[in-house]
Every structure is written in structure tokens, then in C-alpha cells.
């Protein structure tokens, strides 16, 4: 009886831990624009403090969604690393490039990078401007969209 109670308690507690889930490209649908997520370089994901996962086909969709919902309820913010297609990286620590030379699914020309040197390499080749997570939030707040 004690073992069953322990197991049930463990399952309940572990089930609520905010954990990312892999994006299923070609199957998952964007929580913001409802498009099917297919681009492995520009996808994104947020996880609520209760463990619910929302996936996005573009970083700009995630930024707009978070702005509409309020960031307080989210535990994790993740973005695809442009240099490692399909790999998710911490969106709050990522470096972002807005460059007309690198189109993104929703037309904001926004790409995320797991580290600044990679972002600078692509910036040198394609042009554009670099931003931090907080700078993207500020830009979205000033414009009303991204």
C-alpha cells in the first residue's frame, strides 16, 4: 500500500514538471497562427509552469503569443538554433538575427542562435541586426507585433 501511494505521488509530482517536448515537424501546429510547423531552423516552444507545451512555426509567433498571454505563466522559452536545425535552445539566452537575407516562415526575417559567434557569422554573410531576448520583447512592445 505504501509503495502504491509513493508511486502515485511520484507520478503526480513528476508529471507537472515543466519539460520541453520535441517538435514533430510536419505534424505539430503553431499555437499562434495555426500553420503546420515544418521549418527546422525557425520553430519555437514555450512550456507553462504547469507543464503544458505550446509550439510555434516561427520565433515571431512565440514572441507575439507570449506578449498576448503574459510571460508570468511560462517556465521555459525555447527556440530552434539556426545552425543546428531541429535542436532547441534556451530562448532567453539565445542571440537573434533579423536579416532580409534569412527569411523566416512568417516574414519577420527572425532567426535564433544558441551562441553569439554563430549569429555574428551569419550576420557578416547575410547582413542584419542582432538582438537579445529582452530586446525582442521591447521591440514587440513598442511595435505592437513582431
Which functions belong to the PLM regions below?
Residues 114-146:
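C-terminal partner/receptor-binding element of secreted or periplasmic proteins
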Residues 61-101:
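Mid-chain, structured segments of secreted extracytoplasmic proteins
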Residues 12-15:
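C-terminal motif of bacterial Sec signal peptides marking the signal peptidase cleavage site
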Residues 17-19:
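Bacterial signal peptide processing site
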Residues 31-71:
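Post-signal-peptide N-terminal segment of Sec-exported extracytoplasmic proteins
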Residues 2-7:
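Sec-dependent signal peptide recognition
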Residues 26:
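Short metal-coordination and nucleic-acid-contact micro-motifs, chiefly zinc-binding Cys/His arrays
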Residues 108-111:
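A short, exposed loop/beta-hairpin motif centered on an aromatic-Gly-Thr core
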Amino acid at each position: 500500500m505504501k509503495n502504491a501511494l509513493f508511486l502515485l505521488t511520484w507520478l503526480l509530482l513528476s508529471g507537472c514538471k515543466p519539460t520541453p517536448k520535441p517538435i514533430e515537424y510536419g505534424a505539430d501546429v503553431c499555437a499562434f497562427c495555426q500553420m503546420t510547423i515544418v521549418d527546422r531552423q525557425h520553430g519555437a516552444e514555450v512550456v507553462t509552469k504547469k507543464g503544458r507545451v505550446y509550439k510555434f512555426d516561427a520565433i515571431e509567433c512565440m514572441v507575439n503569443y507570449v506578449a498576448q498571454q503574459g510571460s508570468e505563466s511560462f517556465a521555459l522559452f525555447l527556440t530552434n538554433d539556426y545552425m543546428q536545425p531541429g535542436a532547441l535552445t534556451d530562448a532567453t539566452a539565445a542571440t537573434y538575427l533579423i536579416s532580409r537575407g534569412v527569411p523566416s516562415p512568417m516574414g519577420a526575417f527572425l532567426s535564433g542562435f544558441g551562441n553569439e559567434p554563430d549569429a555574428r557569422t551569419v550576420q557578416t554573410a547575410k547582413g542584419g541586426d542582432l538582438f537579445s531576448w529582452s530586446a525582442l520583447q521591447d521591440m514587440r512592445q513598442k511595435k505592437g507585433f513582431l
